[in-house]
Amino acid sequence: MTALFAGLTTLDVLHRLDHVPDPGLKVTSTDFTMAAGGPATNAAVTYAALEAGARSLSTDEAVAGSPDPATRADAPLLLTALGEGPVSAFMAADLAVAGVRVLDATTPAPTVTSIPGLPGSAASSLAEAAAPTIHPTPADERDAAQASAPREPAVSSIIEHPSGRMVASTNARLDTDPARVAADLPERVGVVLIDGHNPALAQAALTLGVPEVGGEDPFARLEARPPHLRVLDGGSWKDWLTPLLGFVDVAVVSEDFAPPLLARADGEQVAGFLRGFGITRVVRTRGERPVQYWWDGAHGEVPVHEVPNASTMGAGDAFHGAFVWALERAGATDPERLIRFASAVAGVSVSSFGTRQWLTSPVLAELVRAW
């Protein structure tokens, strides 16, 4: 059994500074790293690291090992859009090393064969040689340029400094076609997580394993649940989430998650809003403040241990990946245990710069062993 993650993959380019930068000056970074990132992607990488740690507890696995962790049947699946070109190839290689299997649902570039008057198009065939000359319009040339342009992935540039960080990102910009990889999706998974950055990918992931229903009842498919739990990573509200919420079983949201009907992101109101869609299990992270939860009628808070000199890039993603890993193993009966484990893993993630160094921390291995 494994987990399915669906959502955004970006190239994360991270710089660290030892001072707050002056916007008018060029500065030299004190540290630098580059890796595949994005909410669902970082969560999948976290899950893979925890899974590798669990396998290492077995003597046989530790001795035998695996030459390619991404080919293992229990490696997490990432349904995403990597795009084309050298940047995409780098991200694919990075994720393979991290032990993540990728299902790339990028829509292929359209051909230009249907654009009249352009070289290589149907209009330039011998059969139409005698036809009147059709001169391409600027719109035709623009369409041809777009068709031939590589499908480049999203890129995020992050500068981390003592007072915080600055992020510039293209966000999701690739068209996706989940049907292209539908045959590669497993029949069963242990748990699903979506980050909501691409509604088509989210829809495909959330409806995986949902039994077919007949009749004219519009709510029948919402009530026909799969055997696994489906988790929403709600970093922020996205307008296309509304029709998807009925397929979600657990929502893990940040304090920035504010549905448009609410005047402000109040935790109780957010939980009530989600409850209206049938989501009775809500976890709300708030940085260094205690994590709140509303779980099948119960409500509480779980303290978060402060980490000095924290590098918080990807901390929320690590929390989500660890939460999913624990949820798959322990089920949904004890939310505080799930939150404590996920918070501890997130605490390890902020103890070093970037989104990869911490994965080999002995503290992480001890958390897996204690679990």
Regions found by a protein language model. Give the residues of each.
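Positively charged, low-complexity intrinsically disordered leader regions
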Residues: 1-23
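Glycine/charged-rich beta-loop-alpha catalytic/anionic-binding loops adjacent to active sites
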Residues: 21-31, 299-307
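Conserved N-terminal subdomain of the carbohydrate kinase-like
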Residues: 23-27, 34, 48-190, 367-371
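A short, glycine/small-residue-rich beta-strand->loop->alpha-helix junction that serves as a flexible
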Residues: 31-39
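Short beta->alpha connector loops
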Residues: 84, 196-200, 234-238
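Short acidic active-site motifs
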Residues: 177-181, 201, 239-241, 269-270
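Conserved phosphate/ATP/ADP-binding segment of small-molecule kinases
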Residues: 207-301, 308
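Conserved phosphate-binding/catalytic region of the ribokinase-like
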Residues: 266-371
